[in-house]
Amino acid sequence: MWFKNLTLYRFNKPFTTDTETLENALADFTFSPCSSQDISKFGFSNALGKKGQALVHSAENRHLLCVTKEEKILPGQVIKEALDEKVAEIEELENRKVTKKEKDTIKDEITTTLLPRAFSRRSQTHALIMPELEMILVDSSSATKAEELLALLRKALGSLPVIPLSYATPIESTLTQWLQAGEAPAPFEMQDEAELKSDSDEGGIVRFKQQVLQEDEVLAHIATGKQVHKLALHFGQSIAFLMQSDASIKRLKFSEEFRAGNDEVGTEDPLARLDADFALMGSELVAFVNAVNQAFGPLEQSV
């Protein structure tokens, strides 16, 4: 439930789809497990997991959704060994070289044979549609996984006019200014971790962890032309995170004190607790993202 990463996208047009319409659109693209011959399957699943009953969970016009992906695990080395063995057998029996086209066909046959016996793994990715921010927040550290989710959502809705979040001023410039100044603007507070990178290929990368970032050793790297591309920060007393120069947010962690705000709800009704946690997280993410946009903005104008 609690998001751990943020890959952010903003709408080019207001998102006006209501919960019922969104639910119906996703219903045509629900997840189903791999059959014996499927390499992978991908689709929408219950937003609140096994406790939930809907593909979309909405509160205060914020929409939570989830995609599930199942992939068969076929190690490349296993396929290669089987292919090499089969090719060697044919070449010995028929006294000729096997062509590339034949190898491709044999490889497909081997894959088809092995698929029913292959193990599979499942992963889930959540996204939060937030019309009040005109944004979609994807809980993933991988841009590829985020784009997969958006592609399926676009297919379900027919269109999805979103672009990756970016700012007019490079984030690394802003982070570097903060480190040089020795502080981040409220409500943010710098922590003890940063990554500095040179614009030139020869300049290299320097990482600092559990270190006072205002020390001369750190500032000396900035003096030689390096810029801050990752910086650990706190947002008030509620969120710790790692801000990255590509506008993605990693290692998002809500504090125990903040999460305890729903302790009075209890855990006797798991669905009620999930709903309360979703409302609490959603409200804080609105404040958080607004503060991030204000600190790093203005937004880069879309073409």
From Swiss-Prot:
Keyword rRNA processing appears in the UniProt entry: no
Keyword Cytoplasm: yes
Compartments in which it is found: Cytoplasm, Nucleoid
InterPro entries: RdgC (IPR007476)
One cellular-component annotation, GO: bacterial nucleoid
GO biological process terms, semicolon-separated: DNA recombination; regulation of DNA recombination
GO molecular function, one term: double-stranded DNA binding
Short name of any one Pfam family annotated for the protein: RdgC
Protein's UniProt name: Recombination-associated protein RdgC
